[in-house]
Amino acid sequence: GIVSTVNNGVRSDVYSKSVRTDSALGQALGAEALDPTESTNFSLGLTYSPFKNFNLAVDAYRIELKDRIASTAGLTGTGINNILAANGFSNVNYVTYYANLFDTETNGVDVVADYTQQLNKYGRIRWSLGFNWNETDITAIADNPSQLDGINIDRITHRTKGMITDADPK
């Protein structure tokens, strides 16, 4: 992809590349074939109707993911530039690839309440209120490949972790 920015009136293009794990460039960056993500889900749900036209539902859940697939951080620097150039990509500023980077655990609660108000000849109104809370924690992080360790590049950064725990849908 290409991103253009203008700074002090000068246009600056940034070229990025997302590579396949089975490509020569992917292999040079330490990419490996992707394993399927495995999930285990535990949940408990309760419903309660304390009076006519009112319902309350509470669901609690835990989702454990093993070998979660995510994008690496944008890999850049002299060592990366050398790998890119050796594979015919001298005009690329940074590169990413997908990998089994994390094991995660998500815990959450959903609460839904609804009440149906009868308006006689005018019909009815159904009032509904919902609440959700969830939190994702990283329980394991994949090792950095030796190809990147050798040039002091980490494929997982604080931002990469934040995309999993705070930004991605849970």
What are these model-derived regions, one by one?
Residues 57-170:
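Gram-negative outer-membrane beta-barrel transporters
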Residues 1-57, 64, 89-109, 114-118, ...:
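Outer-membrane beta-barrel signature, preferentially recognizing the C-terminal barrel domain
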